Amino acid sequence: MVPTRLFDCIEMHLKDAPNFTMLAGKENGEWIEYSTVKVSELVNRLSSGLLYSGIGPGDFSIEGRDKVAVISKNRPEWVMLDLAVQQVGAVLVPVYPTISEVELEFILKDANVKLIFVNDPALFEKVNALKKNLPNLKEIISFEKIDGVRNWRDLLLPLTENILGEIRAISDKIQYEDLATIIYTSGTTGVPKGVMLSHKNVLSNVIDSLPCFPPGENMKALSFLPLNHVFERMISFIYLFKGTSIFFAESIEAIAQNLKEVKPHLFATVPRLLEKVYEKIMEKGSELKGIKRSLFFWAHRLGLKYDVNKKFSVLYRLQLSLANKLIFNKWREALGNNIVCIISGGAACQVRLLKLFTAARIPIMEGYGLTETSPVISVNRYEEENRMFGTVGPLIENVEVKFSEDGEILCKGPNIMMGYYKHPDWTAECMEGEWFKTGDIGVMVGKFLKITDRKKEIFKTSGGKYVAPLAIENKLKESRFIENIMVIGAGEKFTAALIIPSFSNLKAWCHENNVQ
């Protein structure tokens, strides 16, 4: 079948792989796996419960469709809710669990949310405290058990032919161009912007990104980036359409343990988490003594020389092979020993990390995009010939870019959002005809897109010199003693930097060097 809606991912695998593990989560210390058949059953039963609760497509217009919010950590129920909401023609509005009460109230009011699913008692209390200010809100439902609160399982009505027929009658009317989700992002206005994404936006991005991924069947992925973010959500749909099992990590703190348990082939991450992994590795390497320490830093130096676009001598290749057997194999073991590649996005990844991990046979597919572009514009492919360190890769199929006079990246394609919810004025400001203005400055290096800075972050000193801070910040952040940094100097004689030190690494260094 040719999918035209995001929820078609179930139908695609139902006949050929009914017992394939589609989703998995840990409950009471055990991994609970959900097959394609089980996911299909639960999604249909949840769809039935949503319809019975008065949630549906209304008149099938953007305003007419009911809005359902989810405020939860990653878990199988999150994805099943997403698919069920889509299937009944409603719209899912994901919200970060850590969001402030002020922003939460604004989003729930702005979207006219009728039903909210929360993860746990703490989030229930957070939403319940706002309920008096939310006249459209009918009910708060919890994934975890809370006394006196309806649980998501209470919505799982028994399936009958009549109910299935009712669900099919609605889902058959849902079109490729229809609204699928509203994702709120913090905008320059200070007010969250509701980005409207259609099935076409996200599904075209999924289909056009699939060829960039490594080949292979029966693969497993570990999911820990928030599904509230378009990056992890779209990657999850890639897994669902590709037939890759998604295992949801218990928490950020449990990732290391979950990697060893699940032994995934893939996972998506942000550069900061990779930096933390690297810092841990370097910390352990620094604690080694004698020959082990010498071998560790020899392998490290070899890795820093690696480049996917360079031909190396036989001697270097032999040395790197030895380094992989003696040192880098421990890196792969820490990630579960099955990693085929890591997908990185959300910010620029340090080139030294790309070099080291790739040398250690852990390729990193670094990509680029925004919520408004569903999100992928470009990505470094799995194949080495389509990767270049320091860039965000070639454009994906059916997506075009051009550059304005000041170097801003403009993007056009089926992935460009429908617009900002209730704000055609904001939409008009960020569009130039069919071209979306990304706000990022970039250049093409051959077929590879390179981001040089954020347009709004470039500043001018009092001497008239323009400064692009991103490259400076990324270089300085390579120091393990710097947690975060911001280059400043607009209107001043010189540039400076505000630095947040990495106190844990500074303390360790002081201890090693007898500094009181």
Q: Positions of the model-derived regions?
A:
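Conserved pre-ATP/AMP-binding loop-to-beta segment of ANL
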Residues: 18-21, 142, 147, 161-184, ...
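Conserved AMP-binding/adenylate-forming core of the ANL superfamily
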Residues: 22-75, 79-83, 100-105, 153-159, ...
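Conserved AMP-binding A3 loop
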Residues: 33-36, 180-206
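Conserved ATP-dependent adenylate/AMP-binding module captured primarily in the ANL superfamily
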Residues: 99-129, 205-222, 252-266, 334
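ANL superfamily adenylate-forming
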Residues: 124-176, 281-330
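Conserved ATP-binding/catalytic segment of the ANL
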Residues: 394-461, 478
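Conserved AMP-binding/adenylation subdomain of ANL enzymes
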Residues: 203-220, 227-328, 338
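Conserved structural elements of the adenylate-forming
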Residues: 40, 44-48, 176, 195-216, ...
